[in-house]
């Protein structure tokens, strides 16, 4: 068991990956937490991707304004978030037994990105 960490308020982001039958490993990111289904603001890439491509995916989001420090809030560390997106893409691309990864929410703060909950579903080809 790992000790819980105190985290500052930030922006909740979803980072996920799946094995699509047509495209293979895919990674996605978007506004997370309870807002994922409400706003449907996600960006997808075929995995694996590097941090620069992950950052481009993040910058496509309508929610980028929240991550950049909307209404006086501190901007999120988008580079740290891009590292998380790239890592999830690598995980799905490298492990065929993984059919789905859902990291939601990832809390993006000015000091980094912290996964608060995650689910890995096995079921692909081993």
Language-model regions, residue ranges each:
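ATP-dependent carboxylate/acyl-activation modules
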Residues: 1-126
């Amino acid at each position: 068991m790992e000790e819980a960490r105190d985290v500052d308020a930030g922006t909740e982001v979803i980072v996920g990956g799946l094995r699509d039958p047509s495209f293979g490993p895919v990674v996605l990111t978007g506004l997370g937490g309870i807002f994922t289904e409400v706003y449907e603001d996600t960006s997808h890439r075929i995995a694996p991707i590097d941090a620069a491509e992950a950052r481009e995916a993040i910058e496509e989001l309508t929610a980028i304004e929240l991550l950049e420090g909307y209404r006086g809030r501190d901007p999120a560390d988008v580079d740290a978030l891009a590292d998380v997106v790239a890592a999830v893409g690598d995980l799905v691309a490298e492990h065929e037994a993984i059919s789905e990864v859902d990291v939601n929410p990832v809390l993006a703060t000015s000091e980094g990105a912290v996964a608060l909950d995650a689910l890995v579903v096995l079921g692909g080809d081993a």
